[in-house]
């Protein structure tokens, strides 16, 4: 909204409760993001993942699916990265185990990343 520029494509994988419920019921909750990636992602895309713990099975599955599809991954997490540590192409690990503080840091970091992307268009 600050800059008058062309729109950029993006998709939030947790915004469709129908897709999440259907996938969770038929394939398991751990597949809710991986299945959507299989449908929509293509080589050259980037997947941004957010977790305060880094231990979410659905994010581990999403990283695996992204790798198979040639999709770059950027992981924002706390808790030393948890089980996701070392799996993403880019990791931004907030040095805290306090979920609220990690989420607050994620919001600031996301805005900073978006500003950098816009500055480099």
Task: Set out the residue ranges of the language-model regions.
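Glycine-rich phosphate-binding loops that contact phosphosugars or nucleotide phosphates
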Residues: 1-121
């Amino acid at each position: 909204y600050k800059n008058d520029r062309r729109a950029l494509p993006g998709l939030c994988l947790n915004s469709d409760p129908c897709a999440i419920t259907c996938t969770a019921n038929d394939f398991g909750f751990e597949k809710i993001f991986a299945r959507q990636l299989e449908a929509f992602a293509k080589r050259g895309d980037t997947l941004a993942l957010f977790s305060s713990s880094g231990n979410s099975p659905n994010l581990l599955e999403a990283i695996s699916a992204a790798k198979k599809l040639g999709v770059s991954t950027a992981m924002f997490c706390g808790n030393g990265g948890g089980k996701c540590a070392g799996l993403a192409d880019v990791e931004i690990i907030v040095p805290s185990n306090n979920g609220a503080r990690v989420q607050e840091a994620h919001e600031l970091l996301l805005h900073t990343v978006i500003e950098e992307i816009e500055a480099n268009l």
